[in-house]
Curated annotation (Swiss-Prot):
It is found in: Cell inner membrane. Part of the binding-protein-dependent transport system for molybdenum; probably responsible for the translocation of the substrate across the membrane. The chain crosses the membrane at residues 17-37, 47-67, 88-108, 150-170, 197-217. This is Molybdenum transport system permease protein ModB.
Length: 226
């Protein structure tokens, strides 16, 4: 059989992780992107830089500090222990939290660009019709920014699927609990099981190509990033 039970388990876990992370990224990233697109605060540059840090930081550096923060002596770790949730490292929940931090700029950037492209005119028209802020956002902004949401969701999902360094630092290598496809490929290569590694790696290459093809061949991609 080309794929073992451990391979299939890693695929299932990766898809679950990417799906849940993408939903959380959209929930967290949307208000951040909206604030960055609309604010004139002097903090805009600093907040934007913090959000974009995962783009330039080595995954091991980000993973290390997340591990310390979520550990038993870190602020997040102390909070989760106080709430009776234990610590997050080496758990699926820890992977989700780390993935949200790591993939956040891939969601915020296209959303911010989409919000900025809307301009002031549609918002002014909605205001003259006495639409409230929430009504304006959900009935005017969201439909106009739909290409940006699609782009953000695709990029967030794809980036989460391909994570390795942060996942390994936070989740370790626990079968059916924290072992993703990327970690499973690493295990196969380390054990010189190249045939098994080829099946998974080839699938990742095909998946990445299809994602990029869908983005670059769609006008929605250009609208979301312009």
């Amino acid at each position: 059989m080309p794929l073992s039970e451990h391979d299939l388990a890693a695929i299932r876990l990766t898809l679950e992780l990417a799906s849940l992370t993408t939903v959380l990224l959209l929930v967290v990233g949307t208000p951040i992107a909206w604030w960055l697109a609309r604010t004139r605060s002097r903090l805009k540059g600093a907040i934007g830089a913090v959000v974009a840090l995962p783009l330039v930081l080595p995954p091991t550096v980000l993973g290390f500090y997340l591990l310390v923060t979520m550990g038993p002596h870190g602020p997040i770790g102390q909070l989760t222990q106080f709430l009776g949730l234990g610590t997050l490292p080496f758990t699926f929940a820890g992977l989700v939290v780390a993935s949200v931090f790591y993939s956040l700029p891939f969601v915020v950037q296209p959303l911010q660009n989409a919000f900025e492209a809307i301009g002031e005119r549609p918002l002014e028209v909605a205001s003259t019709l006495r639409a409230g802020p929430w009504d304006t956002f959900f009935t005017v902004v969201v439909p106009l920014a739909r290409p940006g949401f699609i782009t953000a969701a695709i990029l967030g999902f794809a980036h989460t699927v391909g994570e390795f360094g942060v996942v390994l630092m936070i989740g370790g290598n626990i079968p059916e609990k924290t072992r993703t496809v990327a970690v499973q490929i690493f295990d196969h290569v380390e054990a010189m099981e190249y045939a098994q590694a080829h099946w998974l790696a080839g699938g990742m290459v095909l998946f990445s190509f299809l994602v990029l093809f869908a983005l670059y061949s769609s006008r929605r991609f250009k609208a979301g990033l312009s």
